Amino acid sequence: MLGVVPLAPAIDIADETYVGCPPAALAPVVAEPATWARWWPDLRLSVTRDRGIKGQQWAVRGALTGSMEIWLEPIGPGTVVHWFLRADPPGAARPARSGGLDKERQRRVKAWKAHAFALKDRLEGAERVT
C-alpha cells in the first residue's frame, strides 16, 4: 500500500557553532526556559525530550509550528552546538520557493547566530579551553 509522503517543512534549518567549553557548561543554559524566551520570543516551546547534557528537543508553536532541537556534541575540549528548526508558518500556503519564506529562514538563521555567538563569547570567557 502506498502512503502519502509528507511535505518537508517550509523552514528547515540546521546550523553548527563550535563553543570552546564542555557540554556541561552549555546544557544548563539550553535547558533554561528563560533562555528560550529571550532567544525565540515569538515561539512557545514545550520540551518533548530532555537529553540532559546532550541538549533539548521541543515542540514549537506560535509564529511557527513544528519542532526544534539543540544537540550538544562534545568535540575535543569543546562542544559543537547543533541547532535544528523544522517548522511551518501556521495555516500558511506552502509554495516550493517563496521570497517570504526565504526571508524568514534568513532572519531565523541570523538571529540564531547572534545568540550562539553571544553565548560563545560569554562561556568561553569564563571557561576557555585551548
Task: Give each language-model segment a name.
Residues 63-65, 74-80, 99:
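Coil-to-beta-strand transition motifs
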Residues 36-40, 58, 83:
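Signature tryptophan residues that serve as conserved aromatic anchors
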Residues 88-130:
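A conserved amphipathic terminal alpha-helix motif
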Residues 10-16, 55, 67, 80-82:
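Intrinsic-disorder/low-complexity, polar/charged segments enriched in Ser/Thr/Lys/Arg/Asp/Glu/Gln
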Residues 20-24, 50-53, 72-80, 126:
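A short, structured loop/turn motif at beta-sheet edges
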Residues 16-17, 46-49, 67-74, 84-87:
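Hydrophobic/aromatic beta-strand elements that line small-molecule binding cavities or substrate pockets
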Residues 1-46:
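Hydrophobic ligand-binding cavity/cleft-lining segments
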Residues 55-63:
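Short beta-strand segments that buttress and anchor functional surface loops
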